[in-house]
């Protein structure tokens, strides 16, 4: 997942 999602 991208860092802003999880």
Curated annotation (Swiss-Prot):
One of its GO terms (cellular component) is extracellular region. The modification Glycine amide is found at residue 6. Expressed by the skin glands. Belongs to the frog skin active peptide (FSAP) family. Tryptophillin subfamily. It comes from Pithecopus azureus (Orange-legged monkey tree frog). One of its GO terms (biological process) is defense response. It is found in: Secreted. This is Tryptophyllin-T2-5. Keywords: Amidation, Amphibian defense peptide, Secreted. Its main location: secreted.
């Amino acid at each position: 997942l991208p860092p802003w999602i999880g």
